[in-house]
């Protein structure tokens, strides 16, 4: 075992407001330690203290003299980690980081840096869980290095977990909602509707996925109450899979914060294929503050802006985390350019299915101009999709080589297929169904049960927010009725852009009684897990003889012939065009 010299005197450093690091009650020495040599490893900067045990998880978290990480809750044997916090698991909790080495990387008055290392024996993933405390910061930074040289399946998820004292932290916060979640111990006594879903005594439905949210909309999430808050801040989304439409479970009952740096609850990319067989996830910041409920949220919002402005972190000393970054700019030209979502990612694969590399995204302005800051050096494809209007075709421009402090791509032409006449359109092309009825509500599976089996939507009379729903979720017919002043010849195109599917739905599409397409999809679990706006995007451009349309009244029917429980199709937009 290597051990260096003691780099600080604990008493003097604490008095100066710096970081102290003690191992088994004595000033810590940098080096590698067997778990059996670690009884307690404590980091303290006067604002916060945290102690880790021999398995690499935390045994204590103290702010202002208050212990925040005791009385941890969960259901055993259902959750074998019910009494642990600050740890990593994967494959739906079926695998976890096992500490082979606890490394004290750096011990200075400015920083304590430790790493819990799993060498990957017995078919486990080789993992490094790095945890850092900086002087003057009431929180902990972290990152994970995962090695996967043989491209093994990650089982759909890998995450860091932060369990807190539920007696203190009885409120949950994500971008979409705040609320008091029930305790697992109470939930297991109730009627279970489906997995992780219960009927409450008042008849309402609670599902842990009610507290999912989009990473692109959620700069922080966590728990708070009784004078304290703990908020997880991703700081950057570059290391998450699936891009701007990636949504994940972030917090749930028993005061648990979940950082799914690999997650596919809604069909997004699992990210199994890492470049060179290794990927660094993070760094992130877990902020611990104090105050009343409103104060801790307001303070955390200010803090996350401060942390984002520091990116990339100059104190990071990892070859896998380049500090030299590039600002990539340009201007899209084309029908879908205004306010388009612009991304740099791998070529050849829809961004939502990516995860092994890094993804950068920003929304363009009204003129199509975009700026992507802090991009890692490398070769990317430029991807874009519309967030308004009628353009459903995506842009991909390959071989974008990023280097230097800035890269101006100039004008990027976005050529989209267009037809001579748009007869009608329902919704806007943004890969989401949020503009339709219930699409703006808080997540809950009750909404999919409230959509009608049959409806008639009349072009020119019906309203999207009132008469078209976020999803079609029952066997029945959704009819679009419209008048045409004339008959047509040639080719017509019905575009059905789908924001998500659940429950293996089957839909037969017909025009004036003539079937033109039968759709059948696999499950992305979006509506099943209370999503209201998106899952896996799909696009159908269905051509048919324009002669099927007549002068007078016409009907396009979306006939659902089969769907699983709480499943359905979420429509992004539906439009009819003539060549």
Regions found by a protein language model. Give the residues of each.
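Acidic-aromatic substrate-binding/catalytic surfaces of carbohydrate-active enzymes
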Residues: 37-101
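Extended, loop-rich substrate-binding clefts of extracytoplasmic carbohydrate-active enzymes
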Residues: 81-147
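Acidic (Asp/Glu-rich), glycine- and aromatic
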Residues: 131-132, 136-183
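A short, amphipathic beta-strand motif
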Residues: 326-334, 368-370, 412
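Short, acidic Ser/Thr/Gly-rich low-complexity loop/linker segments typical of extracellular
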Residues: 350-369
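A short, solvent-exposed beta-strand micro-motif common in secreted/extracellular proteins
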Residues: 368, 378-389
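Structured interaction patches on ligand/partner-binding surfaces of diverse proteins
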Residues: 387-411, 415
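Beta-strand-rich ligand-recognition modules
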Residues: 475, 481-489, 497-579
């Amino acid at each position: 075992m290597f051990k260096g010299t003691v780099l600080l005197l604990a008493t003097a450093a604490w008095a100066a407001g710096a970081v102290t690091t003690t191992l088994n009650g004595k000033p810590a020495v940098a080096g590698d330690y067997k778990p059996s040599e670690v009884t307690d490893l404590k980091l303290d900067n006067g604002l916060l203290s945290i102690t880790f045990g021999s398995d690499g998880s935390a045994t204590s978290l103290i702010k202002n003299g208050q212990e925040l990480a005791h009385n941890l809750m969960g259901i055993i044997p259902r959750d074998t980690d019910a009494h642990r916090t600050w740890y990593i698991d994967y494959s739906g909790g079926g695998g976890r980081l096992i500490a082979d080495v606890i490394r004290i990387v750096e011990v200075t008055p400015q920083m304590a840096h430790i790493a819990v290392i799993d060498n990957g024996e017995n078919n486990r993933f080789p993992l490094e869980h790095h945890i850092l405390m900086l002087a003057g910061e009431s929180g902990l930074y972290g990152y994970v290095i995962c090695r996967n040289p043989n491209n093994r399946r990650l089982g759909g998820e890998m995450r860091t977990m932060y369990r807190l004292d539920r007696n203190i932290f009885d409120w949950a916060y994500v971008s979409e909602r705040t609320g008091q979640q029930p305790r697992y111990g109470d939930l297991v006594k109730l009627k279970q509707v489906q997995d992780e879903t219960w009927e409450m005594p008042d008849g309402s439905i609670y599902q842990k996925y009610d507290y999912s949210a989009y990473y692109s909309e959620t700069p922080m999430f966590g728990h708070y109450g009784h004078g304290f808050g703990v908020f997880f801040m991703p700081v950057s989304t570059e290391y998450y899979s699936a891009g701007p439409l990636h949504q994940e479970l972030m917090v749930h009952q028993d005061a648990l914060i979940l950082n799914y740096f690999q997650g596919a609850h809604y069909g997004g990319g699992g990210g199994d294929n890492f470049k060179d067989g290794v990927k660094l996830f993070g760094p992130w910041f877990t902020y611990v503050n104090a105050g009343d409920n409103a104060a801790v949220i307001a303070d955390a919002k200010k803090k996350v802006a401060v942390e984002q402005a520091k990116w990339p972190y100059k104190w990071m000393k990892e070859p896998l985390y380049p500090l030299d970054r590039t600002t990539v700019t340009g201007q899209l030209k084309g029908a879908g350019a205004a306010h388009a979502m612009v991304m740099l990612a791998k070529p050849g694969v829809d961004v939502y299915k990516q995860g092994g590399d890094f993804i950068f995204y920003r929304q363009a302005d009204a003129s199509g101009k975009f700026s992507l800051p802090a991009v890692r050096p490398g070769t990317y494809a430029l991807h874009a999709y519309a967030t308004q209007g009628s353009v459903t075709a995506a842009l991909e421009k390959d071989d974008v080589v990023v280097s230097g402090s800035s890269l101006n791509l100039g004008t990027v032409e976005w050529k989209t297929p267009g037809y001579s006449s748009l007869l009608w359109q329902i919704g806007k092309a943004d890969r989401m169904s949020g503009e339709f009825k219930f699409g703006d509500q808080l997540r809950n599976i009750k909404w999919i049960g409230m959509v009608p089996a049959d409806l008639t939507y009349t072009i020119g009379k019906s309203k999207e927010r009132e008469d078209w729903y976020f999803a079609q979720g029952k066997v029945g017919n959704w009819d679009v009725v419209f008048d045409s002043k004339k008959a047509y010849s040639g080719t017509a195109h019905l575009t059905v852009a789908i924001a998500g599917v659940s429950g293996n739905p089957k839909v037969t599409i017909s025009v004036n009684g003539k079937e033109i397409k039968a759709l059948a999809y696999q499950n992305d679990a979006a509506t099943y897990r209370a999503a209201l706006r998106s899952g896996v995007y799909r696009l159908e451009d269905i051509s048919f003889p324009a002669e099927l349309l007549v002068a007078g009244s016409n009907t396009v029917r979306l006939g659902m012939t089969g769907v699983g429980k709480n499943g359905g199709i979420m429509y992004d937009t539906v439009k009819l065009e003539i060549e």
